[in-house]
Amino acid sequence: RPGHGCRKDSTSWAIPAILRATQYQRGVWSMKKILFVCHGNICRSPMAEYVMKDLVKKSGLEEEFQIASAATSREEIGNPVYPPARRKLAEHGIPCESHAARQLRNHDYEEYDLLIGMDKANLHNMFRICGGDFNNKMHLLLEYAGRPDQEVMDPWYTGDFDSTWQDVLEGCEGLLDNLM
């Protein structure tokens, strides 16, 4: 986000300098821990989690990442990925059967390097649950697609899983590029 410690290049927002500094040890990047967050953890954030896991796997970088997702609300705790979101992932050969929605916890802020929200309401609730963002770890996914002021719309309400898929894919590709 502008003015929050990120550098902008021509295509997307760079990862915070603090993340780069804490991850580089003796010439080797340590494991990158990413938590995707949305309202219920049944559509957008699990789509981002499994898309990112797929991108990382296809890049041969599975051992370098820990990727998960969470909700800001308690409404869907324990539920699987919402069926239309699950079908959209399956169309692209991405399984998500093991997913069970969980809520974001205060200590997730210390556990993860980046906490990526899908919309501004998510960010607001993430700040509240985690007690702030003192290390500039919280960002919107579309910052990494070069669209810092845009949000990934919630297909639970819009019914548009194609647009959500495209936004999630672009955001995750940009995020992976920035981390490498």
Feature annotation, model-predicted:
Residues 29-111, 177-180:
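Conserved active-site segments centered on acidic
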Residues 2, 21-23, 37:
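Intrinsically disordered, low-complexity regions enriched for glutamine and histidine
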Residues 2, 45, 119-120:
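Helix N-cap/beta->alpha junction signal
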Residues 114, 120-180:
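Phosphate-binding/catalytic loops
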